Amino acid sequence: HVRSDMLRNVRGGFSLRWMKVLLDNDIEIRAQIVLCPGVNDGDVLESTLAGLLEQYPTLESIAIVPLGLSRFNTEERMRVHTQLEAAQVIETVAKWQARYVRAIGRQPIHLADEFYLVAQEAVPETSHYGEFPMLEDGVGLVRSFLDAFAGTGPDLMGKQSGFFASVDVPSPTDYVRVINPAADTGLRSSASVPVSLRTRKPTVNKPVAVVTGSYGATVMRNALTAQNFDDVVVLEVTNQ
């Protein structure tokens, strides 16, 4: 019923049957659950994870991500998670991660970083994310950034020479291959053309400024404080 309601399709509840066909033919599936507070979290999330374990144990991964909203939203019941709700999601997911390990010997469930930020809880340690296979889903971005910033982990996003990177496309209609067509987050072509800006050395009365969103601002401030970068200003931009 919930799936049919969310898809606005009376037959939507049966849509997952096609996953079994794909899995039976050795097609790798990386599933994603977009969690909407008051709609498909709580008992519904418990039922979803139980059903996936019982019927689709060979799923490569299951990413649980939060609902994204802007001021253009027209659905009155759609809203972001509260701190308490985010903490409850973390608790539920941790419980099911352990159950999956006991049942199938591996842990395919991954929780997006935003839940930890909203709940004001620390993100998991590096070992929790393995090789960080789901950065494009917002899973492990904070931990990978903190590790790279502190110099304790690899730069998983890759290094580009120059301040910007660009690619040349002969025609606007030409196809440009991306690494992950489901969630490309930037220009990562190995044949990119570097474009450098003139370096300006900051003066004492003109500190370096970092412009980022609300969640990024929290992470950035903590990272800067930990590394004693007291001459860097974080400018928070609220998403609307």
Enumerate the predicted regions with their spans:
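Hard-cation-handling environments
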Residues: 90-212
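Short glycine-/acidic-enriched loop or helix-start segments at secondary-structure transitions
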Residues: 74, 121, 220-221
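A generic structural motif
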Residues: 61-66, 109-113, 230-239
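Conserved AdoMet/S-adenosylmethionine-binding subsite of the radical SAM
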Residues: 1-101, 127, 141-142
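Gly/Ser/Thr-rich loops at beta-strand to alpha-helix junctions
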Residues: 39, 67-70, 110-117, 213-218
